[in-house]
Structure formats: C-alpha cells, structure tokens
Amino acid sequence: GQLFLYDLASRKASPLTKDFNPNVIDAVWNRFNGQIYILCEDEDYQRIYTCDPANGKIKQVAASEDIIMSYALADNAPVLFYYGQSASNANRLYAYDLKGGKNRLVYDLSQDKLKDIALGEVHDWNFKSDDGTTIQGRYYLPPHFDPNKKYPMIVYYYGGTSPTNR
C-alpha cells in the first residue's frame, strides 16, 4: 500500500511514499511528536518507519526484532511499544524511547514458549541471478550443527512483493 497526506483546504492528496519501496501496512499519526509511524513489509522483514509530514522524510526505527507484529504509541510521552519476533525467538514486547532511540525489553514470551526447544543458527545467504538481480535468502542450521556431517538443507529465498516472514 501507499501513504497519502490529504490537505483539507486544497482538497488535494499528496503521496508520502511514492518513492518508498516497502509496502505500507498501517500508519498512525503521533500526537506527541507530530510524526507518522508506518508499519511496512520490507522484503522479508516487517519494520517500523517514521515519516515527517512537513518534509516527507522517512527513517527506519531501530527495532530489535525482524518482524514487528503490532505497535502502539503513547499520546503524551515519547514512547513506542511494539512486539515482534525473529528467526530464533517468539514474541517479545519492547518499549522504544522515541527521543533516545533505545529499546527496552518489557516482556519475553519467547522464554516460556521456547524453553524446551533447541534452535540452530540462521544465516543470510544472498546470491546474484543470471540477470544480476540480488536474490535474498537464508539457510537454517540444525541445533548442535557439526560441519563434518551431512544434513538435508532447507533454503528460503525472497522472490516477491509480499514475503513469507522470516
């Protein structure tokens, strides 16, 4: 999706994300700092960005997870709450300081959900196709991986506009 700013006086809409590649999923205008917070699909990630409606500049929020599932903004304080996950953990809830740019882990559901599960490592693995396009992918190693043994391989690569999440 795209994000537009509608001017009530002129009755004109201007695209804020015309030259922005990630797909807009959701947007919230924050009363506290006047910024627009956008949840986006960005390749095989789901990230949060800020958009300054005065100049259209978009910046990524430095979240601690690869997939942001949901977020909420405080009305009267510089705080963004979000929860998300990465390849090796389940949902975690964070408080993000909008002024200082720091994440604080509030609750780790991953500890309970994954306490009896051994996880291997996940590594990015990108390659160039014959036409020069970079194909983004990753591979998963089993728990207690031994490089001297042979294993079946699971390969995932990003190849479309609406990805399978990490």
Where are these regions (language model features)?
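Glycine-centered loop/turn positions within well-structured domains
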Residues: 11-14, 34, 46, 91, ...
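Multi-bladed beta-propeller domains
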Residues: 1-32, 40-41, 51-69, 98-121
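Conserved protein kinase catalytic core
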Residues: 13, 46, 58, 162-165
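Residue position within the beta-strands of beta-propeller blades
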Residues: 35-39, 80-83
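Serine-hydrolase catalytic core recognition
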Residues: 70-166
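Short, solvent-exposed loop/turn segments at conserved positions within beta-propeller repeat blades
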Residues: 1, 41-46, 86-89
